[in-house]
Every structure is written in C-alpha cells, then in structure tokens.
A protein has these predicted regions:
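Iron-sulfur cluster-binding electron-transfer modules in prokaryotic oxidoreductases
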Residues: 1-220
C-alpha cells in the first residue's frame, strides 16, 4: 500500500511539473544553484546526496542544464539559408526544451542550412504523453488540442507547413497517435489526422535526397 501511495505521489509530481517548462525551471533551480557553487562533489563525499534518496540519484543523472534564457529566447521563426525548399514546424517539447534547448537550436540551424523555414509557435505545449501514461486522458487530449490548434493557427497566418518535426522520439510517437485519442469526436479526429500526418522525426525528415544534398553542400 505504501508503495502505491508513493507511486501516486510521484505521478502527481510529474503531472504537475514536467509538462510545464516554467514549473520545471522552478523545480530545477536548487540544482542549478548547487552546481554553480561547486559544492556537489563535497556533498557526495560526505554522503549528503545519499540522504536525498531518489532525488540525489536523479541529480547525478541530469545532463548539464542549458541557461534558462536559451529557452525563453528561442526564436519563433527561422529563415532558410538560400532558396527555400520547405516550410516546417518544430515541436520543441516541454522537458526537451528545458534540458536540451541547445539540441533544438542546433536542429533549427541544420534545417535552415537544408533550405527550410522553421516555425516554432509559442502556443504549443507538452505533447500529452506523460498524462496519457498515467491514465489522465482528458488532460492529455486537452494538451493535444492545444498543439493541433497552435500549428493550425500558424498555417492560417503564414501558409501551409510541409512537415512538423520533433527531436524527442517518444513524444513524436505520441503525436502520431493523436487520431486514436479522438475516435469519438469527428471534428477533432479529422483535425488530429491532418496534424499527425505531417509529424516526422527530424532525422526521418532530413533523410530525403534533396535535403541531404543541400546540407552536404552547405558543409563544404
């Protein structure tokens, strides 16, 4: 029973913080402070980190955290270098954008060098995977509707996107499952199909001859 309670508490913590970058930043603030102070190796030697249990283990597994400003200043629009070959949307993610925003930034630069305009609407949010995994499908669908609408609105204002790319493979798999979440809602099933059909892992998208040739030329 204690384990069930503990697991439920962990689920609620994940549900409350992980899908929301600002809350995640707040939760990670102590880690940033401790790492900047350089005191963590001493705390490990003294056994203090072991006293923190799972939290201490999690800190050891965390990658170097990029500056928060990188996420906050992530451009909404990136222009293709040279002739444009495609317009793509980018799902920046929640955990991905907090912990690895530099990877999203590098991806956007590669896409631009491959001849793509890149759109990263600010109104997008968590894909809903975390809520779906713990059984909160209503919240998962709410987040899905928000993402679908974010890219629909972008296309209405700026024109159609040829693809919607993502770095996080697990989240990408969930984005492709959206139509199955709305089988009892004709309108959103149609809208989610239109969205999901455009979703590709960034490596999948760039593995096309036209983009590979363009990228190779830009690196010479």
């Amino acid at each position: 029973y204690e384990r069930q309670v503990d697991q439920r508490l962990k689920n609620r913590l994940v549900e409350f913080s992980f899908p929301y970058p600002n809350r995640m930043e707040l939760a990670l603030a102590p880690v940033r402070v401790l790492r900047r102070s350089g005191i963590i190796p001493l705390l490990r030697k003294l056994g203090v980190m072991k006293l923190l249990g799972n939290l201490g283990d999690m800190e050891a597994l965390l990658p170097p955290l990029p500056p928060m400003q990188k996420r906050l200043k992530f451009p909404v629009r990136w222009k293709a270098r040279g002739p444009r070959q495609a317009s793509v949307g980018m799902i920046t993610g929640c955990v991905m954008q907090v912990m690895q925003s530099h990877v999203n930034e590098a991806t956007a630069r590669v896409l631009c060098k491959s001849g793509c305009d890149v759109a990263a609407p600010k109104t997008q949010n968590c894909c809903g995977a975390l809520h779906a995994h713990i059984g909160d499908m209503e919240k998962a669908k709410e987040l899905a509707r928000c993402n679908i609408a974010a890219f629909e609105d972008w296309e209405k204002e700026h024109g159609a996107l040829d693809a919607i790319v993502i770095n996080a493979a697990g989240c990408g798999a969930v984005l492709k499952e959206y139509p199955g979440w709305f089988k009892d809602d004709d309108e959103w099933e149609t809208r989610s199909k239109n969205f999901s059909e455009k979703v590709q892992d960034v490596s999948e998208f760039l593995d096309q001859d036209a983009f590979k040739a363009r990228l190779q030329d830009s690196l010479r």
